[in-house]
Amino acid sequence: MSIKEEVESRKTFAIISHPDAGKTTLTEKLLLFGGAIREAGTVKGKKSGKFATSDWMKVEQERGISVTSSVMQFDYDHYKINILDTPGHEDFSEDTYRTLMAVDSAVMVIDCAKGIEPQTLKLFKVCKMRGIPIFTFINKLDRVGKEPFELLDEIESTLEIETYPMNWPVGMGQNFFGIIDRESHTIEPFRDEENVLHLNDDYELEEDHAMKNDSAFTQAIEELMLVEEAGETFDNEALLSGDLTPVFFGSALANFGVQNFLNAYVDHAPMPNARQTNEDIEVSPFDLDFSGFIFKIQANMDPKHRDRIAFMRVVSGAFERGMDVTLQRTHKKQKITRSTSFMADDKETVNHAVAGDIIGLYDTGNYQIGDTLVGGNQKFSFQELPQFTPELFMKVSAKNVMKQKHFHKGIEQLVQEGAIQYYKALHTNQIIIGAVGQLQFEVFEHRLKNEYNVDVVMEPVGQKIARWIENEEDIKDKMSTSRSILVKDIYDNYVFLFENEFATRWFEEKFPEIKLYGLL
């Protein structure tokens, strides 16, 4: 198979949603259809010890939430599909944002009872900003929720995107009978013992079935006729440009409507995209020279071995295990001998990968998030990945001074993952960590204890705003006060931590020569 044929067979997407909309459950059911797992774990079944395949970290299993991004690959219908299951909790939106830089499309999961929720809206905006095509799966139709037209209207008005329902539900909750596939004119019944039913061109039931006289069926057909009368046809170009979202109804937990979605997804989702570099070069996925970028680093995927994995998206060419590449940030050549694919915490050696694939590189501390790797004599770097400005800060220290070595090792590794940000006070050497949300601190404390055997003392600091400095050479010691602490970040850049907006404005007025800026 040529590189072009291999690349065209790749589909790489992230699943985004508000917590509890069913994102991880949908991921599992997709893996079932791909034959990647035999039995789906359930997120909520904590007593049975069955945990979701994509929720591999101990804290995720205990809480039933995703706080890291998992990567899974499976084969389906001649395609290789890469799924990135993103953190559902808003405190980990930075990790999700970076993950969205590594995909070519996204699947938005919506709870039919709740509609568009805050985290869904936030993540959708990121996809829209990047022009990522979005597929919508409206979940939990076996529970009572909003009417289909109400949900479609909410998507269109709130997200400002056109919708095209690919199927239509017959009833919901206790009276949920199934879904009508618009293209094949078939009804997929919700109960397994029923056979697929067929509709003629006028949406009349061809089989003699009791449902003919059911009010839920009659209502569904009337609604579908209204949709048809609108006369809109499915526009794949509008999907690929991010202006239209195909909508699917189903129930991930009941494994219903998932295959219907998956079949349509592989037909319509884009193959791997070209990528822009800082040098304004467009790198095609069909280019023969290898290139890729690191979008995530995860420590302790195997707690027994204290390993670190750098997640790399292949952008062009073919990756071959043992090949020589250049790390563009340092301009150093290295041979990649250890590479892996994922099924949550199950890993398998990767010998070959092409554009669109996500592979793990064993990392001894060489890589940073955003690093570009290239083969041959290429001289470019992909555009930097975004970093968020923290809004919460904590002083942190080891409870037991004898654990200093483990404490510093743990902080170093967890900071390099990008889950928290690291600062050191200029004159006291006090370590301060920053986060977007409180849960990040809780997970940080939990992981230090469980993965590094270190108990920590964490105290809030009064500062809430971080600002970096464009002209560091103009900084003077007197500028650092109790209301504007001067610290250094992990990259040795100067940063002021301010108490509030008033303290920030006061500083800017008193020291107009200092040019401050925030991150995202």
Swiss-Prot record:
Cell compartments where the protein resides: Cytoplasm
Gene3D superfamilies from the UniProt entry: P-loop containing nucleotide triphosphate hydrolases (3.40.50.300), Peptide chain release factor 3, domain III (3.30.70.3280), Translation factors (2.40.30.10)
Residues the entry annotates as binding GTP: 17-24, 85-89, 139-142
Superkingdom per UniProt: Bacteria
GO molecular function: GTP binding; GTPase activity; translation release factor activity, codon nonspecific; translation release factor activity, codon specific
Coiled-coil residue spans: none
Domain tr-type G, chain residue ranges per copy: 8-277
SUPFAM superfamilies per record: EF-G C-terminal domain-like, P-loop containing nucleoside triphosphate hydrolases, Translation proteins
A GO CC term attached to the entry: cytosol
A single BP term in Gene Ontology: regulation of translational termination
Main localisation: cytoplasm
PROSITE patterns: G_TR_1, G_TR_2
Keywords: Cytoplasm, GTP-binding, Nucleotide-binding, Protein biosynthesis
Family per record: Belongs to the TRAFAC class translation factor GTPase superfamily. Classic translation factor GTPase family. PrfC subfamily.
PANTHER family in UniProt: PEPTIDE CHAIN RELEASE FACTOR RF3
Protein name: Peptide chain release factor 3
Species in which this protein is naturally found: Staphylococcus saprophyticus subsp. saprophyticus (strain ATCC 15305 / DSM 20229 / NCIMB 8711 / NCTC 7292 / S-41)
Lineage: Bacteria, Bacillati, Bacillota, Bacilli, Bacillales
Gene: prfC
